[in-house]
Amino acid sequence: MSKVYDWFEERLEIQAIADDITSKYVPPHVNIFYCLGGITLTCFLVQVATGFAMTFYYRPTVTEAFASVQYIMTEANFGWLIRSVHRWSASMMVLMMILHVFRVYLTGGFKKPRELTWVTGVILAVLTASFGVTGYSLPRDQIGYWAVKIVTGVPEAIPVIGSPLVELLRGSASVGQSTLTRFYSLHTFVLPLLTAVFMLMHFPMIRKQGISGPL
């Protein structure tokens, strides 16, 4: 086993990486509220795992979506648990994200030289909210249908471009199969990919600049 480790150590310098991670200085003023970003990340990872598991059973069509969710909850092995964890962690992720943004703002973590960290964080917050909107529509139940109809209808009040924006969001003039397909694609592919990209920008900047000091 040691020979295998030595082989990787010689090429990747694993010990140096481990030492850098474990020896990072943590300011004395840091408390549990500075863990909110990490908790949000943990919730996101839970979302990815449970969401991936549900894609094996979920069918993104207006005629089968609701029935497939019922199947997950009543027939699939541990499906009820996986979907419940997905819902609970989704709510927790939104809550932790909001608290994290407030903590950073109230402690001045957005100030120089951390402006870019703040910008990427705000983008991640918007992406988190987008997860909620797109995911809410996927069960194709009454609550999800009317929520999507209202949310996608908001831009209609904008002069000139309002109606085209609504059609762009829905895929048609009304909420239907095109809307479900778009929201499913956004929820399972586009948003996770964008979130991963901005996380890969966000965390190295935190690592490089360190945690902001007390006010």
UniProtKB/Swiss-Prot annotation:
Residues engaged in binding heme b 2: H86, H187
Endoplasmic reticulum found in the keyword field: no
UniProt cross-references to InterPro entries, sorted A to Z: Cyt_b/b6_N, Cyt_B6_PetB, Cytb/b6-like_sf, Cytochrome_b_N_euk/bac, Di-haem_cyt_TM
Kinase listed as a keyword: no
Protein topology in the membrane: Multi-pass membrane protein
Residues that bind heme c: C35
Ranges that cross the membrane: 32-52, 90-110, 116-136, 186-206
UniProt miscellaneous comment: Heme 1 (or BH or b566) is high-potential and absorbs at about 566 nm, and heme 2 (or BL or b562) is low-potential and absorbs at about 562 nm.
NCBIfam families named among the record's database cross-references: PRK03735.1
Name used for this protein in its record: Cytochrome b6
Species per Swiss-Prot/TrEMBL record: Liriodendron tulipifera (Tuliptree)
